[in-house]
């Protein structure tokens, strides 16, 4: 606790450089090899962060060193307040962001900017651009476009608008806006990957659900955001770079629909369990028949995988019954 409190002193004592206090929150787990680049870019934004929190689910001393170095060299050497929060218990992405967000609010944050450990903002002006978008469109929450880290014109995750799947950044703009004047995609946001939340937004929708651990906790938070009546969206003028995750969305029916099939048993466990939980929630129940149709077709018709279908059903039943056990 002493080390944590010492880290908080610089934020409490120094004069405010901006009218709004923006606190960054990063959650990491055993990725010190790639975390350093993310922290370096976060620490050198043209609109500087006022404080940076790292929640370390791996309790790795190397992460603390990376954070301290980022804080010391931030903003052309003027420095930045940092807080390292090691966890003896793996909280998952959901619990890690919940802890970090609550701590940011306790510090007095007006805005909380989230980032993960294997991605990073696309340059030094991302935070400034997001805040400009907030002001222009009067937003309570805004996210950048999430693009593939080694192919920035490609979306890291496909996005469906109506019946059409969008896979490139340019496809997010409206057809009647060839000059790209409108910089907001309203009502849609990728949460955690560069997502910026106002304190008012978090007071209204809460923080991620610890029980979900990972895989879908951001979708459940998005559900709350949709139902809150708050104004939010994606700022098309800036991006967050992330490893491509499109491969786990398997096309079915000639590409008209997709079924999510992650590449590891752990990812499948939490994805399908959490989707069972999510589909039982207000605002998502209308999608249940579509969910059954997609996965029945994928497992039984396309893959001919009866065992996989049974496991999908078992896991979604666990989630629907709120038996949100950790994977054995």
State each model region's role.
Residues 124-158:
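Conserved donor NDP-sugar-binding/catalytic core segment of glycosyltransferases
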Residues 31-45:
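Short, well-formed alpha-helical segments that are part of the catalytic scaffolds
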Residues 109-118:
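Short beta-strand-to-loop acidic/aromatic patch adjacent to the donor-nucleotide binding site
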